[in-house]
């Protein structure tokens, strides 16, 4: 079985997603993977088969406005955390997913956490890879510039923004075959850059982070934090402080990884995730 590329029309929005259903389904809830900026569902493509081979149905969408999902005009979609949460809720309903385990990474993966704290009864287990978790977290300067008037319009139309962010954030060269997937949407349509700009402009970091900080401290579902220690944007201390505030958490340090750990350390991450997700 290999990864399927699927799309589904939900209301007026088309979602693109990757999924793999297991040949021998085990008695586990599905696992939903949410990407950050400027990653896509593709960033999970080495991990999905590992989970499917162990009986999990694994699903990774491109967020609305990103990758191969719809890129609505800002008049039709607000690009705020609330708008993303509402769209995600409708996507899950369309796939008839009620309870699931959630894996998030990055800026925008953070919206997945906001979703989880609003719907704790739907989350079986939570795994967090390098995602902003504290009110100290700021958008990286390069991403901030992308949301500025004029400069942002220019920067977000340059497909090489992908290379700069992914390689700057992961501190490693990202293979061309992967960069081609990430650049593709920006080469295909100027809507991709516009949607990215709107997303960055509307992340509402201060209020989102306050929400996430308080959400984590009241969170009781089993959680695994997998942290690329060399992240240039999100310090290890902040992640550890967040973990300290939580009831039921294990912390896994990935000593050589940085902001996008799943790009280069998918083997270690799959192994950790499987141990965690299979626990009863």
Task: Give the residues covered by each predicted segment.
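Helix-loop "lid/cap" segments that line or gate small-molecule binding pockets
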Residues: 160-174, 181-187, 199-204
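Conserved HGGG/HGGXW glycine-rich cap/lid loop of the alpha/beta-hydrolase fold
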Residues: 20-68
């Amino acid at each position: 079985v290999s990864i399927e590329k699927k799309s589904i029309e939900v209301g007026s929005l088309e979602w693109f997603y990757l999924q793999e259903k297991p040949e021998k389904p085990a008695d586990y809830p599905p696992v939903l993977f949410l990407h950050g900026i400027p990653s896509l569902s593709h960033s999970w493509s080495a991990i999905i088969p590992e989970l499917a081979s162990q009986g999990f149905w694994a699903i990774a969408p491109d967020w609305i406005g990103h990758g191969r999902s719809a890129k609505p005009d800002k008049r039709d979609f607000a690009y705020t955390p609330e708008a993303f949460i509402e769209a995600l809720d409708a996507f899950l309903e369309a796939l008839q997913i009620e309870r699931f385990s959630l894996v998030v990474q990055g800026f925008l993966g953070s919206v997945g956490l906001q979703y989880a704290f609003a719907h704790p009864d739907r989350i079986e287990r939570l795994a967090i890879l390098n995602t902003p978790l504290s009110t100290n977290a700021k958008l990286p300067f390069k991403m901030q510039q992308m949301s500025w008037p004029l400069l942002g319009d220019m920067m977000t139309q340059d497909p090489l923004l992908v290379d700069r962010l992914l390689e700057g954030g992961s501190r490693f060269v990202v293979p061309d075959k992967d960069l081609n997937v990430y650049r593709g949407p920006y080469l295909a349509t100027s809507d991709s850059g516009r949607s990215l700009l709107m997303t960055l402009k509307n992340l509402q970091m201060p209020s989102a982070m306050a929400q996430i900080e308080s959400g984590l401290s009241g969170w009781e579902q089993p959680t695994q934090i997998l942290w690329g220690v060399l992240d240039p944007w999100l310090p290890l201390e902040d992640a550890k402080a967040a973990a300290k505030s939580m009831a039921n958490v294990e912390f896994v340090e990935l000593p050589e990884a940085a902001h996008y750990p799943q790009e280069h350390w998918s083997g270690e991450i799959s192994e950790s995730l499987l141990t965690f997700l299979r626990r009863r």
